[in-house]
Amino acid sequence: SAGRECDIAVDHSEFTNLPQAQIDECVAIMKAAGMNATVSSIHINGWFGAHNKLEGARWITRELFDIDLDATLARWVYIGDSTNDQQMFEHMPHSVGVANIARFVPQLAHLPRYVTHGERGAGFAELARAILAARP
C-alpha cells in the first residue's frame, strides 16, 4: 500500500500495564524524534511518514475495489477502539466504537457516533450481527 511498511510498537496494555504518564512520555519521545505516534488499545505505535488510517482506507478502496471512498461514505461503516481511530470517527458518518473505547473518551476530540455494548471482538460481533439483521 501507499502506507507505512513498518512501525515501532510499544506494549502498554497487552502484556503489561503502563501508567498514562509513561504512555504520554513514550509518545513525546517518538514525536521529538520526528515520528508520528498514536496510541491503540494495546500499543503505542510510532512511524515515519505521513500515513494514517484515513489515507489507507482511501487507498485500499480505490486500488482494490475501484471505489472513491469519499464519494461513497454512506455505504461504509468504521469500527475502532482507541485514540488512533479518532480521525476515522470524525470522517466516517457511520462510525462505531467498541465498549472499551470508554477508557479513551477523555482523550478523544472526535467520538464514534455509536458505541457497542460489547468490548473488543464481542463489540465487533455485535456490530456485524446488527448489520446482517438490517439487510433486506
Predicted stretch roles:
Residues 30-34, 109-112, 132:
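Generic secondary-structure transition motif, activating predominantly at the C-termini of alpha-helices
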Residues 44, 102, 120-122:
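Residue-level detector of flexible, active-site-proximal loop/helix-junction positions
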Residues 1-77, 82-91:
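Conserved acidic, metal-coordinating active-site core of Asp-based
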Residues 49-52, 108-110, 129:
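Short secondary-structure transition/capping segments
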Residues 113-135:
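Glycine-rich phosphate-binding/hydrolytic loop that grips phosphoryl groups
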Residues 57, 75-118:
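Acidic, Mg2+-coordinating phosphoryl-transfer loop and its flanking beta/alpha structural elements
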